[in-house]
Each structure stands twice: as C-alpha cells, then as structure tokens.
Amino acid sequence: GTGAPTQGANGSTDVKIMVGGVEKVIYLPAKLADQLGYFKDQGLNVQILTEPAGATAENSLIAGDVHGVVGFYDHTIDLQTKGKCITSVVQMADVPGEVEVVATSKADAIKSPADFKGKKLGFTSPGSSTDFLTQYLATKNGVATSEYTGVKAGAGTTFISALDNNGIDAGMTTDPTVAQLLDTKKAKILLDMRTVQGTQAALGGLYPASSLYMDCAFVEQHKDVVQKLANAFVKTLGYVNTHSAQEIAAQMPKDFAGGNMDLYVKSINDSKGMFNTDGKMKADGAKNVLEVLSQFSPNVKGKKDNIDLSKTYTTEFVTKVQ
C-alpha cells in the first residue's frame, strides 16, 4: 500500500487524492479546497488526480497508489464484502447528486423506471455507483436487470455523444453534463437525485454519496493527516454553503467551465444544495445505502447481516473540526 505521506520540502505533508471525475460538481469540494488554499493552510500539499470512473478510483486506493478517494460512499460497503476495510472520513452529501435523464426523442416512451424494459441505459462504467443505482431503480420498478441493456457511457462528452448517436435511450449523470443536455434540449429529467425530496422519491430514503474515503489502517496510523484533511474539506463545505454559484465558479480553474461560464454557474447552482455543511454521515442514510445495495448488488446480496456499517464511515474527525 501507499506508505506514510512523505514530508515535502517546506515541512508540508504530501498527500495524493484520486477524484472520481474532478470536473463533476458532485465532487467540486476537492478542487475547490485546493483552489481556496485550504489544504496548504493545514500544512498539506495535496495532489489531486482524476479518474472519471469511480470503480477505477477505488482500485487505485486498494493498490496503494493514492491515500484517499473522493467518490461515492457505497464503495466502502461493496469493498467490505471483498474483505477490504475502507472508511468515509468526510461525508459531503446526503444525496447522490445524480440525475436520470432521458433522450428528448424517447421521453414519451420512458415516463418512469418501469419503462426501462428493453431500453439501453447509460452509466459511467460497470461496477460504478451509477450502475448500482440504475439496477436498483429498475428492480424496484419491476424490471429485472436482464431486461435492459446497461451501457458504459462515461460522463461529459462521451455521455452526450452516446445519447446523440442512439447509443443510450436514457442514463444517469451529474452536473455539468445535466445542465449541458437541458440547455441543448437533448434530454429531459426523469429522476432528480440532487435534492433530498427527489432522492427519497427515487430511492426510498437518503443515499449519502460524495465522500472522502480512505483505507482504515491508514486512518488509524495517520490521524493527524486525516484531521487536517477533514478540517480543509469541512471548511470548504462551509464556503459552498455561504457563497453563490457565481462566486464558487470564479474560484475554479477556467477550463472547468468548458467555454460556457453561464452554463457552468447554472450547473453549480442546480447541484450545490446537495452538499451538507458539517461533513457528518447521517446514520439512517448509511443504513439506506446498505438496504439499496443488499437488494441487487451481487457482492452485498445475502450478506447484509455480515456488514459492519460502523467500519464504513467515521465522524471522529469531522466532529473535531475547529
């Protein structure tokens, strides 16, 4: 695994964090914390790497290439079934921030997940959280996973072109892709999981998603580093909560706007309500994630009672944030 974080030249600590798609608004706090200088304030030199597929990001953590991942909490439960102890140390959102969009041309044929039968449904990659959630939505609405075709569609331009070229009829994605699709009228919203209300309607409860998760052994051995990361992330959540989408967009790298600042601001505005302010996991949210996964995830199915949820997240660090 990754050894101890190394000491930088100026006495700062080098930390590598992999983000499951750094330009996604659902993971905005990672790059924003960096841009605001909050990591440096904590004496951390954080290198932010990006890997658009969450399933691949978790592999780099297990392989020890990075110290932490900014990704979906559900991976911690999934990985526990494979004998890995991974824990969320900062829980940034109580909802997924995902949207199920349907191609405008197919909107009359797909009015709810019950209409998924025989359709091509996009997600980022197999084994990703969007794959999990798509399976759940189908199953919950009477469509077996064998009755639709799952398509690896990525995010951003790859997702949009899949929709354009009839590669998918509907799919799950996040802002800024959602804002782009609505702006060009290429897609309509079927289910909106950017809000608590929309998430409860779609998933029957909260579904805590965006988090900073790390290897349990690393967390035990480097509590000081984890505390500093928690300090920076929670401070960033506070910033998101107290600043406008315009102010937030202005702090981000220019290329994140993809040449359309107004649309980027809109995408932040449409999604920023998903973030909590304290980085704390809600226990009933964690329980609902397990509930959802245990219904169809091949890894979790039948093992629900063996999962120790207390090992999948901790509030130890966020409660001590100054």
Label every model-predicted segment.
Residues K287-Q322:
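Conserved C-terminal helix/tail region of periplasmic/extracytoplasmic solute-binding proteins
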Residues K24, E51-A55, T124, S128-S129, ...:
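Soluble non-cytosolic domains of exported or imported proteins
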Residues V219-V300:
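Secondary-structure end/capping motifs
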Residues D115-K119, D164, S211, A232-K235, ...:
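Flexible glycine/proline-enriched surface loops and loop-helix/loop-strand junctions
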Residues T158-P253:
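Pocket-lining segment of extracytoplasmic ligand-binding domains
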Residues D41, D108, S112, R194-G205, ...:
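Short, solvent-exposed loop/beta-turn-alpha elements that line the ligand-binding surface or hinge
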Residues G3-A153, N165-D175, K186, L190-M193:
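Short, glycine-/small- and polar/acidic-enriched structural segments
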